[in-house]
Amino acid sequence: MYNREDYREALEEREKCDLHSDEWRFCQAKVQSIATAMVAAGNNWMVGEIIDELYSLSDCGCELTDEAVRFDLWILESNGLEEKAEEMEKMF
């Protein structure tokens, strides 16, 4: 079972990589896997992190078609949080 520490360590590892390099993509997949597992396990803290990330992506000008936005919405939708996903989708 993953926890906050695992997630934060994966984020730190990703930060050390050049953006969009092969190493960064590997680390990003790790971050996304941990986040997905935590939400699937019912971790409300991780759900909050996903929601915060969606707000940040919206503030940065990302669009509904952006991969990061689609992935975060999918995590919510596929774990029984369809209403929250729909609410978040309206920001984009």
Which residues does each predicted region cover?
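Acidic, low-complexity, intrinsically disordered interaction modules
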Residues: 20-83
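Short intrinsically disordered terminal tails
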Residues: 1-4, 19, 62, 83-92
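Short terminal alpha-helical segments
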Residues: 1-26
